[in-house]
C-alpha cells in the first residue's frame, strides 16, 4: 500500500495462516481514519528463529534485515503480540538499532475508541490474554477497555499475568494432539464464565482455539469485535 509514516506489521501467522485476522485489523484502522502502510513483502521479525534456535547469528541477521525496513517508518503497529514482544524486548536487549516507535495493535485500538464510538451491548465477553502481552510486556488494560466499551467483560479464572496458553500454530504443525488438548482446556476455563464470546488478541491463539471451539460458543478477534460494535 501507499507509503506513510506508520507501518502495520501483520506478522507471519496473520499473513499466511490467519488472513481473517489481518483483514479485520486493516478494516478497523481504515474505519478509524488511520493512515498506514502494509507491505507486500514483509520481512520476518525473527520471532520464529528465536523460538526455535535462540539468539544465534542467523537469528540476529534476520532481525537486522527487519530493522532496515522498520526504521523507514516513525511508528510500527505490531498486530501479533509475538512480534511486538520481539521488537520491544529482543531487538532492544541485543542492540539491533530499532528507532521506530513500536505499539501493540490492542493499545492502538483502545486509543481509537473515542473516534470509533462502538455501541455497548449486554453481550458477555471474555478475553484470552496472550502471554507475550500480559507477561512479557505487562499489557492487560487496553483489551479490557475495548471489551468494556463493546459489552460486559467476564474474566476467566486464569487471566492477566496468570493467563493460560490457548494454542500456537507453529506447534500445531508438529504436535496437533497436544495443541488440541491445550485449546480444549482453555475452552473449559471459558465455559466456567457467563461469557458467550471469546475475544483473542493473538492470530495464532485465535486460529487454534477456533479449530476446537465448542458448539454454541463464539470466538472473535479484537478488531472483529470492534467492527461489529461499530455497525
PLM regions with names:
Residues 1-231:
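Iron-sulfur cluster-binding electron-transfer modules in prokaryotic oxidoreductases
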Amino acid at each position: 500500500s501507499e507509503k506513510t509514516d506508520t507501518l502495520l506489521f501483520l506478522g507471519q501467522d496473520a499473513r499466511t495462516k490467519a488472513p481473517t485476522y489481518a483483514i479485520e485489523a486493516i478494516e478497523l484502522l481504515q474505519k478509524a481514519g488511520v493512515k498506514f502502510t502494509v507491505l507486500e513483502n514483509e520481512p520476518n521479525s525473527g520471532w520464529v528463529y528465536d523460538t526455535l534456535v535462540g539468539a544465534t547469528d542467523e537469528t540476529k541477521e534476520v532481525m537486522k534485515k527487519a530493522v532496515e525496513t522498520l526504521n523507514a517508518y516513525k511508528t510500527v503497529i505490531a498486530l501479533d503480540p509475538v512480534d511486538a514482544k520481539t521488537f520491544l524486548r529482543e531487538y532492544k536487549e541485543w542492540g539491533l538499532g530499532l528507532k521506530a516507535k513500536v505499539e501493540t495493535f490492542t493499545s492502538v485500538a483502545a486509543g481509537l475508541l473515542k473516534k470509533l464510538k462502538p455501541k455497548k451491548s449486554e453481550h458477555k465477553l471474555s478475553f484470552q490474554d496472550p502471554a507475550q502481552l500480559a507477561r512479557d510486556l505487562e499489557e492487560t488494560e487496553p483489551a479490557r477497555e475495548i471489551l468494556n466499551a463493546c459489552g460486559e467483560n467476564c474474566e476467566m479464572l486464569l487471566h492477566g499475568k496468570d493467563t493460560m496458553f490457548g494454542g500456537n500454530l507453529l506447534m500445531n504443525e508438529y504436535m496437533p494432539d497436544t495443541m488440541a488438548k491445550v485449546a480444549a482446556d482453555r475452552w473449559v476455563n471459558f465455559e466456567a464464565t457467563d461469557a458467550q464470546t471469546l475475544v483473542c488478541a493473538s492470530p495464532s491463539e485465535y486460529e487454534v482455539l477456533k479449530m476446537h471451539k465448542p458448539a454454541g460458543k463464539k470466538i472473535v478477534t479484537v478488531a472483529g469485535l470492534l467492527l461489529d460494535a461499530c455497525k
